[in-house]
Amino acid sequence: MAKAELFQKDIPKEERVFYYESEEDEPIKTKEQERKEKVSLPEGYEYIPKSWQTRLKSRLMFLAFWVFGHWYEKCYWKAKFHGREKLKKARGTGYVMYCNHTNPFHDVFGPALAADRRIYTVISPVNLKLPKIGPILPMIGGVPLGVTKDEKKAMNEAVDTRLVKQKKCLVIYPEAHVWPYYTGIHKFPAGDKSFKYAARNNVPIFTMTTTYHRSHKKGQERPRMEVYIDGPFYPDAKLSDEENRAKLAEEAYNSMVEMSKHNSYEYFKYIKKAKKK
């Protein structure tokens, strides 16, 4: 399979095929994933920086990130966003946005343009090892999953603060694995676990589904994007946190499946390997 790049040129057809055994296969892997290496957070990692200088630097970097992202999404990918008006229903509260995982670079910038406020995105600690962009991910809103018991506790406290006190948008990719240009929706490998943030904080969720379509530019194979926002879906006060997790996960999955029906162009082909007898 072709290598993913920030500025993706047209890819030869023979390089746009991926044979897989399981939906949890990784078409794109970092060196750490190739080595099956567990990556820990840096010692003394702060999920919410205490220093005002660091917070100011983060705001400025996010602004620059958003400006570049606006150009990248609108001009390079010709992306159109549908349904942003639905976010108005969540004014006065934080919310969680669940997205399909189909492009390692669009998936960084897209939610920032889709949301109506600053985003904080749950990421794997492995992403902190990515060349160049890895070290700055926390400055532009990356929230690495905790590895140790203390890190997990600190992460949960930070997420609750962002959602409840600061009323921000938490972004999650429940499919977990990036499948470039994939036009379907995978079952969520972790089930309803990532829906605990909305359930326990009683905040709504939205979905953001990226779809692919033929370019309007003559001779260009690389697709353009149309992005659909759906929701809100709310926790039910009559249900327990566990029941709400299951409810919200089902609603998010069904929403993303429905929105994925807008896809009209299969740029990459995914073929399941036949089982060996």
Identify the residue ranges that each predicted region occupies.
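Membrane-anchoring hydrophobic helices of lipid-metabolizing enzymes
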Residues: 2-96, 106-110, 275-277
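Short amphipathic alpha-helical segments and helix-helix/interface helices
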Residues: 69, 111-112, 134, 160, ...
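Non-catalytic C-terminal accessory region of glycerolipid acyltransferases
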Residues: 2-39, 156-277
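Conserved beta-strand scaffold positions in the cores of enzyme catalytic domains, especially
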Residues: 81, 121, 142-144, 205, ...
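Short, flexible active-site-adjacent loop segments at beta-strand->alpha-helix junctions, enriched
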Residues: 85, 101-103, 110, 176-177, ...
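Short, glycine/acidic-rich beta->alpha junctions
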Residues: 103, 151, 186-190
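Glycine-rich anion/phosphate-binding loops
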Residues: 149-155
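Catalytic core of membrane glycerolipid acyltransferases/transacylases, capturing the structured
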Residues: 89-149
